[in-house]
């Protein structure tokens, strides 16, 4: 009887792990979301360039072609720059920027300056895709 119980528990564990592996989200958490504009007063000296070097095109931001978020630094361990996340109620965004270190457990959605800024608490976000790992070329000449 003990062997049967152990076998059932092992099978249940495998089923649960396979179900979570098969889901599309790699990491899920609840955060505060805010919005920002690509202007000097809300960014650094180069507001049209993100932390990973992506150039912001305000026309694409306004039309929704370029959907970028900045992420608080405490979340970078699980959601690295270049990742694709799903923000519940808002859609898919690329993580291209980082926030000031004083902010914790927060994401900042880039939006055009013509839209009204907002803040929402306890919004679910899901990591959908991590960026590809860049391999170092060992045969590169110096």
Task: Label the predicted regions.
Residues 3-11:
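Sec-dependent signal peptide recognition
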Residues 12-21:
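Hydrophobic h-region of N-terminal signal peptides that target proteins for export
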Residues 21-142:
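Solvent-exposed, well-ordered loop and adjacent helix/strand elements within mature globular domains
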